[in-house]
């Protein structure tokens, strides 16, 4: 910041947006190859490229914000607006899935047997694993709030404990969801019910994995004393994202698991 007469961060040229876009392309084609030809080579390459991009991009941002002091209050304000707009875009993303579900379920066509769930589909019991998943995510919402309050009050160890509990609950949710998918009596190819169910809950599961990764990074950063009560936007963004994931799950549970069954 020595020869700078403004509070904005002039970012150095970075290769990570390019490698990130490449990894997204590889993962998309990899998913198609896996679905149609049962080959996971391209998908694994895409995931590896994505992991490397995430690691190196996060490393650069941590260096610029924590060690070089580029994240001034003005920059943080811009980041906050960016995160809010990103979450709004995600809301619209999930709106499309809910639209597809309600479009199909509110007026089932004769091909579906004129009823919902369609003839031949045995839906999952909403009072079994889905209800446990709901409790797990609601508990994680409480623990992330505990972590935030602990950080604001300077209780570092309490914050680490709460963050660890949140991550553990996120991983537990993912394992429960995976076991539910494995044991489900229908598949993604079982008509509109299977496709809307697996795409909506699958994308939510992906967001839980992303949120858990975000929180794991925050956990290791807190171990290295990167956050203070006044400078912790990385953690705040992760907490906002986690609450968003919580709320989306409540809508999924009420719409697809409970009402849809």
Swiss-Prot record:
It comes from the Eukaryota. It is found in: Mitochondrion inner membrane. It is an enzyme of class 7 (translocase). Residues 1-15, 67-72, 153-155, 224-232 are mitochondrial matrix. One of its GO terms (molecular function) is cytochrome-c oxidase activity. Its main location: mitochondrion. Keywords: Membrane, Mitochondrion, Mitochondrion inner membrane, Translocase, Transmembrane, Transmembrane helix. Its EC number is 7.1.1.9. Residues 35-40, 106-128, 184-190, 257-261 are mitochondrial intermembrane. GO terms for biological process: mitochondrial electron transport, cytochrome c to oxygen; respiratory chain complex IV assembly. InterPro entries: Cyt_c/ubiquinol_Oxase_su3, Cyt_c_oxase_su3_dom, Cyt_c_oxidase-like_su3, Cyt_c_oxidase_su3-like_sf, Cyt_c_oxidase_su3_a-hlx. It is a multi-pass membrane protein. The chain crosses the membrane at residues 16-34, 41-66, 73-105, 129-152, 156-183, 191-223, 233-256. The keyword Ligase does not apply. It catalyses: 4 Fe(II)-[cytochrome c] + O2 + 8 H(+)(in) = 4 Fe(III)-[cytochrome c] + 2 H2O + 4 H(+)(out). One of its GO terms (cellular component) is respiratory chain complex IV. Belongs to the cytochrome c oxidase subunit 3 family. Component of the cytochrome c oxidase (complex IV, CIV), a multisubunit enzyme composed of 14 subunits. The complex is composed of a catalytic core of 3 subunits MT-CO1, MT-CO2 and MT-CO3, encoded in the mitochondrial DNA, and 11 supernumerary subunits COX4I, COX5A, COX5B, COX6A, COX6B, COX6C, COX7A, COX7B, COX7C, COX8 and NDUFA4, which are encoded in the nuclear genome. Component of the cytochrome c oxidase, the last enzyme in the mitochondrial electron transport chain which drives oxidative phosphorylation. The respiratory chain contains 3 multisubunit complexes succinate dehydrogenase (complex II, CII), ubiquinol-cytochrome c oxidoreductase (cytochrome b-c1 complex, complex III, CIII) and cytochrome c oxidase (complex IV, CIV), that cooperate to transfer electrons derived from NADH and succinate to molecular oxygen, creating an electrochemical gradient over the inner membrane that drives transmembrane transport and the ATP synthase. This is Cytochrome c oxidase subunit 3. It comes from Tragelaphus oryx.
